[in-house]
Amino acid sequence: MTDQKQMNTVDSMLPIPQLFAFGLQHVLAMYAGAVAVPIIVAQAMNLPMEDLIRLITADLFTCGIATLIQTLGFGKIGGRIPMIQGVTFASVGPMAMIGAQHGMTAIYGAIIIAGLFTFLIAPFFSRLIRLFPPVVTGTIITIIGINLMPVAINWMGGGIGNPQFGSFTNIGLGFLTFLIVIFVYKFAKGFFSNLSVLIGLIAGTAIAFAMGVTNFDEVGRSHWIAFIEPFYFGLPTFDWASVLSMIIVMLVVMVETTGDSFAIGEIVDKPIGRQELASIIRADGVSTIIGGILNSFPYTAFAQNVGLIAVTGVKSRFVVAASGVILILLGLFPKLAAIVASIPNAVLGGAGIAMFGMIVASGIRSLGKVSFEGNHNLMLVAISIGVAMIPIAAPNFYANFPAWAQIILKSGITFGSIMAILLNLLLNGVNRGDEIKEMGRR
């Protein structure tokens, strides 16, 4: 049985078997989202299957490198917190447009320059931390959870585009997985209780296999080893309009990363100050540069995994570092990736309901420490969450806006976060009370 105190700090080192068991749990939770962007880009560019496979393996490999950079850190790069890294969905639209006009090499040229921009601007962006008092961070954490819930719900239905979406089989599998997670979380002890999501995913997949809903045929068709070749599509080219659009994407990423950082800090009881935030954003920049070199994409924190930390209570950054090692192996050995890919969406959705709901609960807990008397905080929270839900309630609401504006507006997390910051400035001013001074000194 695992000693709970052994896992209740960010710097706790667990036995190797436990590290990789908990690390695998994180990988299974994020895998579907991790491979979605390369699939979408390949489809938009009409790339052959061989190139799609290269994009997926390069993405997984670079996800692992990016996660190791963020969790282990070196020098002033990396936050040294349990933050798993994945490709940002904010980059999909701009990359598709750049690729259609200028080809893959222009995509990677823009990514490399945008990554360098992110690295250089990190210490300046981190000075904005005084704009994130507890009412803003609590609101942003809540918004992150709310905006992730549709992901889990669509997974539970079978995945968008699935002709069997919403079938009794898919929904039943999702709820069964959800119930298994709850049962293990409630009645198992120690180590196994903390593995409730992993056990739910494995049990749900086994049930799906017995029902004929999933199979492992793709494992046999996959190659044993993949080679990650830098600049596979050619040396990068630089179109400055494309570079500018990717820089806008990275500004959005910095806002989202800030929110995710505060969410993780809240859950693992580690204050995120100016220096920590700068290190986290620098890591995003370095990982994005590496992504451009290795035929991958811009990197940021994967909010899906924040909820998993809250569910399991395992706060060790070395667990997520183990996830990084597993992701590297998945990128190098496609047969392993094919096994993970066989987990049905419905099963992922059942686990996702619990994970993403925990992010919402963490945000509410954070807001519970905020005073709503004699100030405008209630209006700030109400409007920020309201505008963040627009893309959820009406996905085409901003369809007639310019492409650059849609990058911001169609992300409920980004627009809701920006709204919370602006409303705090408008309604409360730049509060220089004790809370903000304490954050600014870090």
Residue ranges of model-derived segments:
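The first (N-terminal) embedded transmembrane alpha-helix
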Residues: 23-40, 84-91
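Membrane-interface helix-loop-helix modules in multi-pass membrane proteins
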Residues: 79-109
